[in-house]
């Protein structure tokens, strides 16, 4: 039986590729997709979800737009990484269908309520929508199997020295998610920076030769440019968000540890930092499965294998 999931995302090149991977995988049943503000403005990320589903010929999946700003802060976007549209690079179709009239939280709640089994929430942007869901629908917590997030880091930040972008955008929301009591799986920079796509991998995807693999290669061509900056020391581009879907499909290619994680919301230098109690110093019970390593080749092979689905 396929695993039911809701994807909350802010496309974003790597979010788009996470959608491609999820919808090529019969092991997963994508019951709804909601958009969050983050990589671009809320209007653009919602439009990008609709453009990707139009491209993938999946207008049957319910879509709803989410919160227009973080819980307690002004919105920050990453247009320097993802371009003016949020998905600069390839020529993507215009949306062929409209989103639902309700909000992301309403669609998530309806999906959870109607599901016969608990649903996994995959969240690849800021945690605003998920936090609003948890706060407004405590009666639905038992319908959530787990929350798999791309966000945070045990070690280094990528937006500030201490903070990863998704968590930095809305640290209060992330803290609600981590302390919710629902199992959380964290794909942070510790693992996503090891899930790099190299130039040769992009050519491998392009050579698959179907329309979707070609678009993925073109998305990666654009995404690669930002990551060529010498300050990162990368060989390729880290494919952050697809790590969440890849973990659901092939957990054996990831190394994880069980740890307590809290989010710093006040610090002078550390706002948005995910504080991981690696050495069990707090006495707090672990609340997260934290990814720390990945078999890079296994990750690339999984992407290549699933891109064949679109032949």
Curated annotation (Swiss-Prot):
InterPro entries, A to Z: I/U_nuclsd_hydro_CS (IPR015910), Inosine/uridine_hydrolase_dom (IPR001910), IUNH (IPR023186), Pyrim_hydro_RihA (IPR022975), Ribo_hydro-like (IPR036452)
List of catalytic residues: 240
Transmembrane is among the record's keywords: no
GO CC list: cytosol
Keywords from the named record: Glycosidase, Hydrolase
GO molecular function: purine nucleosidase activity; uridine nucleosidase activity
Keyword Hydrolase (UniProt): yes
PROSITE patterns attached to this UniProt entry: IUNH
Entry EC no(s): 3.2.-.-
GO biological process: nucleobase-containing small molecule interconversion; purine nucleoside catabolic process; pyrimidine nucleobase metabolic process
Family of this protein: Belongs to the IUNH family. RihA subfamily.
HAMAP family: Pyrim_hydro_RihA (MF_01431)
Function: Hydrolyzes cytidine or uridine to ribose and cytosine or uracil, respectively.
Record protein name field: Pyrimidine-specific ribonucleoside hydrolase RihA
Species: Salmonella heidelberg (strain SL476)
